[in-house]
Amino acid sequence: MAKVLVLYYSSYGHIEKMAEAVAAGARDAGAEVTIKRVPELVPEEVARKSGMKLDQPAPVATVGELPDYDAIIFGTPTRFGNMASQMRNFLDQTGGLWMSGKLVGKVGSVFASTATQHGGQETTITSFHTTLLHHGMVIVGLPYTEARQMNMDEITGGSPYGATTLAKGDGTRQPSENELAMARFQGGHVAKIAAKLAG
């Protein structure tokens, strides 16, 4: 049984909801799944005034626990076409793991959210992949066998790089069932590959 960590950052709950779907898909594929988040960097008073979701039940992860998993599925909102600074800050603390090769051969996968259809979903995921490749991780995306990413009947996220959701400029749009289904598929797909690699 593969051990999968779903590690995310979510300001307003969109990525949190996607993380839950990713985790459900991995569990359904037989994996032992843990959901954790990275620490918030925004001062609490500022976060509250901005309406950020501070009551997320997922515990905060530590860098030292990452090698305990066969696969890590990362979730982040987009910030100008890149991952959020909270996730970047967490990953920038993994130098010791890089030096010792602790993540080499682990499966890495990414899902994301943007405000708009063309707000940087794909660049966020592919730029995230650079860090995972430096760690020697095996990148897994969202293959076209998950045909929901080709749905043209509604506005939807999703690409071969990973599941995504669109939050709308004011954050009022929640992940659609189509997007959540892709997230579940990605979780299951990663879990199956991780189980094969773990032997």
Curated annotation (Swiss-Prot):
GO terms for cellular component: membrane
Cofactor: FMN
Origin organism lineage: Bacteria, Pseudomonadati, Pseudomonadota, Betaproteobacteria, Rhodocyclales
Protein known as: NAD(P)H dehydrogenase (quinone)
Catalytic activity: a quinone + NADH + H(+) = a quinol + NAD(+); a quinone + NADPH + H(+) = a quinol + NADP(+)
Domain Flavodoxin-like: from-to ranges: 4-190
Chain residues that bind FMN: 10-15, 78-80, 113-119, 134
Top EC class of this enzyme: oxidoreductase
Keyword field contains NAD: yes
Residues noted as binding substrate in the record, renumbered to the chain: 98
PROSITE patterns: FLAVODOXIN_LIKE
A Pfam family: FMN_red
EC number(s) per entry: 1.6.5.2
Residues reported to bind NAD(+): 12
Annotated cofactor note: Binds 1 FMN per monomer.
Family membership noted in the UniProt record: Belongs to the WrbA family.
A GO term for molecular function: flavin adenine dinucleotide binding
Keyword set, alphabetical order: Flavoprotein, FMN, NAD, NADP, Nucleotide-binding, Oxidoreductase
InterPro entries associated with the record: Flavodoxin/NO_synth, Flavoprotein-like_sf, Flavoprotein_WrbA-like, FMN_Rdtase-like_dom, NQO
